[in-house]
Curated annotation (Swiss-Prot):
This is Protein UL148B. The keyword Chaperone does not apply. It is a single-pass membrane protein. It comes from Human cytomegalovirus (strain Merlin) (HHV-5). One of its GO terms (cellular component) is host cell membrane. It comes from the Viruses. The keyword Isomerase does not apply. The chain crosses the membrane at residues 10-30. It is found in: Host membrane. Keywords: Host membrane, Membrane, Transmembrane, Transmembrane helix.
Amino acid sequence: MALDTLAGLAICVGLVMGVTVIASCALLVFYYCDEREDGRPSKLLQRSIRRWRHGLSTESLTAILPDGSSTEQEIYHTRL
């Protein structure tokens, strides 16, 4: 009896996860891949690509180094 309950619960969880994945993919397609009437990608997709490319080119490394003249720490940003 307990195995039947666990099997039913596992099936329900699997169905919910599957529906969630399908709904997420549908939303991504709807928001990001929706082409305008002129055949160009949507502005949201273009903006996302631009931000992704900008993020790759402007990654920064933050190091917290102690300042020798005081007890406070200064934060230095170094571009990679």
